[in-house]
Amino acid sequence: AAPCSCPGKPGRGDLWIFRGTCPGGYGYTSNCYKWPNICCYPH
């Protein structure tokens, strides 16, 4: 996944292309939606 950032969050997340939700099994705890992609934290 490509790196991305969410407003107000330190570090970087994983950008998932053309997804509306973060995939399970990666330990993501938060996300921000960037249509049509989603940024999932933490990386």
Swiss-Prot record:
Entry keyword Acyltransferase: no
Family matches, as Gene3D superfamilies: Anthopleurin-A (2.20.20.10)
Keyword Disulfide bond part of the UniProt annotation: yes
Compartmental location: Secreted; Nematocyst
Superkingdom field: Eukaryota
Cysteines engaged in disulfide bonds, as pairs: C4-C39, C6-C32, C22-C40
Official protein name in the record: Kappa-actitoxin-Avd4p
